[in-house]
Amino acid sequence: MLIVCLSVLPERMQQRGGEQGREAALALEQEAQPQREAASGRGKQRDSGDESSPASDGSLSAFARGLQIGVKLNNDNKVETVPLEWYVRGVVAGEMPADFEMEALKAQAIAARTYVVRKLLRSGLSDEPLVSDTTDDQVYIPLERLDELWGDGKAKEKLARIGQAVEQTANLIITYKGEPIQAAFFSTSNGYTENSEDYWDLALPYLRSVASPWDKQLSPRYKETVELSHTEARRKLGLDRDAGLAMRVTSRTEGNRIKEVQIGGRNFSGREVREKLGLKSSSFTWTVSRDYIRITTYGYGHGVGMSQWGANALAKEGKKAADIIAYYYTDVRVEQASKLPRSS
């Protein structure tokens, strides 16, 4: 049995929509230096001539039909092996609410499949099933657990909708200049998406900032306020216990998130503050009172790529999955994986 090793990328916090692959940071940061040296054509699996090679016949489709993907179920400490398209179903179930519009579900399915195909071509085959079911990769929910997860007696209906989205997009992936993209996605924007280099220090031409105004009105995750004691904030930020806590924003990203900020005499990136304090977004305001700090965040997730709530809004407006993808990913194409060029 062939098992794909996909220990990689694109964030999700929990079942109802979020981010991928530790926000895709691991994969993107690991690839940053090589991609600076060579713009494309990296990491393809060699053509061994074996029929188990996805490129041995110049096509991925025949291989993919029999492909089994090993998924590490962290809570159970075991591996589940499932066909590729069933894996995509489990990811869509884990990454997007099943009651979202059909075209949004289709866009999510295409993004999830693109993730797998990209990693397959870059990582090749392995006996080690290292795809996690968590945000270290893509959130994956075993299909037999969906009834328990959803808990509303509608698992059959919801799974049918997800199955429809996956089946109607079968073999479709997102490409840029003929190669699968890093199909980053997240839950909710602050009104704009981010340029990839403003979060991961790696500029990808298809991950550009665009307006996403729908999130504010539609997403329940758009705004959140948390309070931290002065002691807790200093501890998490690594500041001296007598350091001041006034915040001064020194620069912002094109997506209007905090790029650089000064707190307690130290410089931080917006991402650093987000991760150290466990914030939902790097778009935030900060108010210091006598006893605590009140932080209000706008949006949920890293902000790079497709906003899921924005995608749902576009679908409600009548946009198709291809339109949604074209809006959030710049200058890309949606095409059959079987049309990928033969590996060299």
Regions of interest found by a model, annotated:
Residues 1-344:
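Conserved, single-site charged/polar hotspot
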